[in-house]
Amino acid sequence: MDKEKKYELIPSDREGLYRVKALKDFGKVKKGDIGGYVECENNLSQYGKCWIFDNAIVRDNAVVSDNAIVWGKAVVRGNARVADKAQVFDNARIYHKVQVRGFAIVRDNAIVRDDVIVRDDAQIWGRAVIQDKAIVRGFAKVCDNVQIYDNALIQDNAQVCGFARIWGNAQVYCKAEIWGNAQIWGKAVIQGYAKVCGNAQIWDNAVIQDYASVGDRTSVYDKAVIQDYAFVMGNAEVCGNAIISSDKDYIVFKNWWSSGRYFTWTRSNNKWKVGCFFGTGEELVTKAYADNVEKGIEYKKIVDYVESII
């Protein structure tokens, strides 16, 4: 059996760890090459072309197998698995029960932990943190300072970068792009060629799809849908069952005379969202008059204006 081994363990200068030394040529490894560190032989399969290069460490019950490679100063530990033709390198950290498979790449200072699955041709880099039971697959790309957790799913050709955060059961797929400080959670879905950026927040069962773009400080939630080529920016607050398909499907006003709060009107349901209020224009004016006459007069001017142009 020893004659069939492709490497042996040799002492190292790190307590509790050995280095791997190639016993034959395979892949880009030559007989006699000294690789990275392992805790025991179970950390690196004797089969396939898998290898640990440089000062990379694989320890605990972690396993590198098939044709996967780990190099640089990367660390793989816990019960993690790096298999198929996956690559983990630079200062990347893979912990717990993570699975990195297919042609997936994890690099730079990325951290992937818990029960995360990274597979297919997915790539994770920068200082991205992926945790809990999140899945990144397909040709998805996650980078920069992104945080993805809970049961979030990123797949297909989706791209998530900047300081974006995605959690809950949110899904981002097709060729959707998320960047800036965008936050997406709940059961929200971002699909098609949609773009979410700036400080936008999308949650509940909201859907952003097709070629729609949402940015700035826009909030989209409940069962609202932004679709087609709609461009929703500013401080819009889209909720309820609103559907926005174009720039003409919503209007945002600012209360410049007192509180500075924003009013959002959506055409599809003819509803207004102002602070905690959500309802018809008539209901909004009635509520404003109940607070004080001056407020009622100003609110009525806004409602009347919108009704005059729709």
Model-based region annotation:
Residues 1-49, 254-310:
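Terminal amphipathic alpha-helical/low-complexity segments used for targeting or macromolecular assembly
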Residues 236-258, 284:
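Leucine-rich solenoid repeat scaffolds
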Residues 1-72, 77-120, 125, 131-135, ...:
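Extended, small-residue-rich solenoid/repeat segments and analogous flexible loops
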